[in-house]
Amino acid sequence: DIIPQNLNAGGVHMDNEKNLKDEFKKADIESINLWHHREIRTATINDLEAVAAVEAECFPAAEAATKEEFAERIKFYGDHFWLMFDADKLISFVDGFVTDQPDLTDEMYENASMHNEKGAWQMIFGVNTLPAYRQHGYAGELIRKAIFDARAQRRKGLVLTCKDKLIHYYASFGFIDEGISESVHGNVVWHQMRLTF
């Protein structure tokens, strides 16, 4: 939407410079700046502090993974973290390991060594976006990236659990509600959702 429409096939603007400036003035300059500086990449141990801080801001203590748990997760499956940065600031991330087990269990949250790089299912343990950066589609962009990567890696699909109020949100990405999960993580009722390729 922010790219002027009146370009010829070679990408050369057909009108004068003033028209180009006018079109960009109509665009959301803040969105342009965020788009321009956003980076998505996997995690290394150097991201530990930032990841733990975002998690703590996004989830109640009973549900949030600890810094120590994230250290283990990054050690075993850093390539299955999708981190989004605004310049140097971590603003959103998605993570989860890969397994042949079809259902997400509470043990998986606590035992990163269960990761099996050749597994059939990409689990999603957390979808986190800092409150100040919500409602911009950043989490959705990371979910789509996780789906894209899982498909490229020839997984069977992805599995996550969510609260009742988010079923509709995840359904918009193709996840199907399978009902109440056996998970009691954080003493909360969770729905298991699955996207099968």
Residue ranges and their predicted role:
Residues 143, 150-162:
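Conserved GNAT acetyl-CoA-binding A-motif
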Residues 1-13:
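Short, Lys/Arg-enriched N-terminal segments with co-localized hydrophobic residues
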Residues 23-27, 98-101, 161, 171, ...:
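Conserved catalytic-core motifs of GNAT/GCN5-like acyltransferases
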Residues 92-128, 134, 183-189:
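Conserved acyl-donor/pantetheine-binding loop and adjacent beta-alpha core of acyl/acetyltransferases
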Residues 37-51:
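A short beta-loop-alpha structural element at the N-terminal edge
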Residues 129, 135-148:
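Conserved acetyl-CoA-binding loop-helix of GNAT-fold acetyltransferases
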Residues 61-87, 93-114:
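Active-site rim helix/loop that mediates acceptor-substrate recognition in acyltransferases
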